[in-house]
């Protein structure tokens, strides 16, 4: 059933978890390779490194005991942002490129499900982003040490949370790129990202006693809708709390991870549903 | 006119591997979502070991229906069975090798890497992949370029890598979209020979072509499309033999208008005879068995027979006739 033996005795494993995994792995491999060739990727990586170098210069202006602190907060803010940029741009372009260059037409007719293809793209991009985040974190660590600071366990956990956010943004990007053309899907993803980053602010405003969100009913409804349909990305940005000495306990990390992965799954499933209905003419 | 698929079932044939049931596809284009009917109610069936030519001019709907067979496109209505399954089932597609129309692959990969990748998608193990890659790149004559990135490959070379990857998993059915187009004469000859060899090995071949010449030797059966409609299908021998039973004659009619009218009236009584004015004279196309009646009518009516020959239809004649019938026959 799950295996097919060809006319000349070749064994094809088609069904079953191992076969599915092998196919997804093949897509992941090719995606990493393709995305890893993109000039865009190296541009963003180079930009992030430049910004880190800039933070060193900037920290010269700071008070002696504030130097490491500045590098620390700068890194925690800038590194994830640069990776999010990569996720949004590559996520918007990757699927479209396969359609545009017609490479998809040779791949989808193979015994592979469209869901496996999307999963492969998602995991491939995630792998690349993990590499980017790791490289940048290493450089950041070097700069921190240079400025008399250190990379603490809470800071590492904080970066881990940022990676969960990256996974989520990647699946949002794939969702929109299964839906529309690259520019629009990039814009939409950016929109959701920004909205997600500020939902906690809106939440605060909603529960305040004064202000437009508290007092104007239409704004209140809009705010509530936004809070309901957009994942709260503030969950994954804890650098301020870390600076104030918060330990980022594992209970928080696991709850936030579960939250992020659930949302990522929602968007990934949405991407698959959209992608499965598409005609590739 | 169009034979219903059910009528050509023949128990001596192998198992059914592909069936189209009233396949239709309508695209909506532009701001007003104008309907373009690319494929209309095409029914066909194919058996193991057969080689079927899917023929028709550009834009007749070949690629669209082929993409439906591979689940790249969802039919608007109708159904496709591939090895008794839906084309969306990977197990059905596992037995198919598809060559896209003007194939494209990742241009940063080498032929070896393309084959490896495709082999993985078919669930072949590493050793088999390596062995098949080597065999197939040799078969299509790409062993010299095996480790060069596809960027910079000519169209003919891309077609070769397309063919190699379609054969990777030793599929039972090859679905090739325009395998002969875009090749130079030598390349065409090589691909034709490969197709004949694959057929000899017992592979089933479904291929499309917009060029009707020089493919007669490649197919047992044809399905001819015209503007999305299957206008003729069946075994090539049957389709063309029927036309070998026709004759064509070149006539001289009497110069006297009254005699001419009389003779024309006599000729019109011969069943199945059609007259056509050619620059060289009047041509009559008629069933071969009616030739004696024609000669008799000519002798009595003062006409002359200048030429008489059996009508050997080519695929092109067949297509032209069917397409004309359709335009005249009041079908939209
Ligand atoms: N994506 C599409 N949108 C609109 N019309 C299309 C699309 N793809 C094909 N068509 C139309 O469908 C018809 C059949 O095209 P196609 O299947 O490519 O023909 P063939 O392969 O026989 O040359 C053509 O009229 C073509 O313009
Ligand atoms: Mg075509």
Which ranges hold each PLM region?
Chain B
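C-terminal coupling/interaction segments
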Residues: 2-10, 15, 288-332
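Short loop or secondary-structure boundary microenvironments that flank
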Residues: 86, 253, 257, 288, ...
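A short linear hydrophobic-aromatic micro-motif
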Residues: 141, 189, 271-276, 304-309
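ABC transporter nucleotide-binding domains
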Residues: 15-18, 22-226, 231-232
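ABC transporter nucleotide-binding domain
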Residues: 192-285
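A generic structural signal for secondary-structure junctions
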Residues: 28, 92, 123, 162, ...
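Short loop/turn segments at beta->alpha junctions
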Residues: 110, 125, 235, 287-290, ...
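Alpha-helical elements of the RecA-like P-loop NTPase motor core of helicases
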Residues: 90, 107, 261, 292, ...
